[in-house]
Amino acid sequence: MDAIEQLVFAGVALTTRALSEARADLDLTLAQWRVLVVLGEEADGATISQVAGRIGVTLPATSRQLRRLQRRGLVDVSRDERDRRATRVRLTDLGQAARDDVISFRRERIAEAAASLDLDPTMASPLARIAEALDQP
């Protein structure tokens, strides 16, 4: 496994750990986490098709995840006021709090790991550009 693959693997492992430790009460899956991440980036929420496109899964699979999250009180699903044919999804306060808790947990663990290393501060920009490029459809 090369360095990039190790970094990706460690990131997924860290997220899994954060989900099980920071918000064990919610028993979130990685798939559900991805939905919370996408919705947290959209102040006005997103349509189901927008969420599906961002996480790269089918509409039926996205709808199933959203129903599960809605039953747990993490998302609110309603008709889009601008386009009554569309359904808009938003994080609830609980969903936003869960997202914030997991992100904080990850940031704390990353800061702890980075503090013990002599890292080049200019590394962050190229890594951010790679992440941005990978997020493009």
Model-identified regions with their sequence ranges:
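N-terminal leader segment of winged-helix/HTH proteins
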Residues: M1-D27, R72, L134
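Generic structural concept
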Residues: E5-F9, Q32, T92, A124-A131
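N-terminal helix-turn-helix DNA-binding core of bacterial DNA-binding proteins
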Residues: R17-P60, R72
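C-terminal regulatory/oligomerization modules of transcriptional regulators
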Residues: M1, L119-P137
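A structural signal for well-ordered alpha-helices, especially hydrophobic packing surfaces
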Residues: T15, A43, R99, A131-D135
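Alpha-helical structural segments
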Residues: A10, L14, G40-E42, G53-R54, ...
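Charged, amphipathic alpha-helical coiled-coil/dimerization segments
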Residues: R67-S125
